[in-house]
């Protein structure tokens, strides 16, 4: 596991963004872990979060022109990622985000920031049902741009209602890669080597066996 992945897991645990135990999800499944990126809510947290995204993006070797953070959670993520890419890797990438409701005065429209053109790197926290990504894809297509890849914080590697995960459906439908800072396998590898959390490994393995995807 790359060092930035291990550091991100420790960071998420320290902020209670990542917790282990028993959690009932909206789907009704009882999960042995819970991830709430909304708890990254201070300047220091967001600065570090951006650095982890930037590390994952650089490690992937992605080729892209514009960073797009879809409303609402993607807005602060896109902003902090663009700052981190410049500060850490001297990459000055334009950033764009959308409004949920278009304005008909001032600058107007539903986009703020850079024009949405060329190869788009979409950043968000997680993909649960894929609805937000599909809405973002409509915006990207309407601007004659194309999706280069999606980068999220956590890939649960978990089936939806069918055999595929929401992420696999997005990859299939839009022929793009969905990358993540960490995924379920990274979490399991981490807790396997951490005595403080190793008690949760059997439940994690059972959950992966029941709901996991390749």
Swiss-Prot record:
A GO CC term attached to the entry: cytoplasm
GO biological process: 'de novo' pyrimidine nucleobase biosynthetic process; 'de novo' UMP biosynthetic process; pyrimidine ribonucleoside biosynthetic process
One of the Pfam families matching this protein, by short name: Pribosyltran
Cleaved signal peptide residues: none
Binding site for 5-phospho-alpha-D-ribose 1-diphosphate: 26, 72-73, 99-100, 103, 105, 124-132
Enzyme class: transferase
Molecular function GO labels: magnesium ion binding; orotate phosphoribosyltransferase activity
Cofactor dependence: Mg(2+)
Reaction it catalyzes: orotidine 5'-phosphate + diphosphate = orotate + 5-phospho-alpha-D-ribose 1-diphosphate
Enzyme Commission designation: 2.4.2.10
Keywords linked to the UniProt accession: Glycosyltransferase, Magnesium, Pyrimidine biosynthesis, Transferase
Gene3D superfamilies linked: 3.40.50.2020
Annotated residues for binding of orotate: 34-35, 128, 156
Pathway(s) the chain acts in: Pyrimidine metabolism; UMP biosynthesis via de novo pathway; UMP from orotate: step 1/2
Taxonomic superkingdom: Bacteria
PANTHER family registered for this protein in UniProt: OROTATE PHOSPHORIBOSYLTRANSFERASE 1-RELATED
Subunit structure as annotated in this protein's UniProt entry: Homodimer.
Function of the protein: Catalyzes the transfer of a ribosyl phosphate group from 5-phosphoribose 1-diphosphate to orotate, leading to the formation of orotidine monophosphate (OMP).
Family that this chain belongs to: Belongs to the purine/pyrimidine phosphoribosyltransferase family. PyrE subfamily.
Name of the featured protein: Orotate phosphoribosyltransferase
Organism: Mannheimia succiniciproducens (strain KCTC 0769BP / MBEL55E)
Gene designation: pyrE
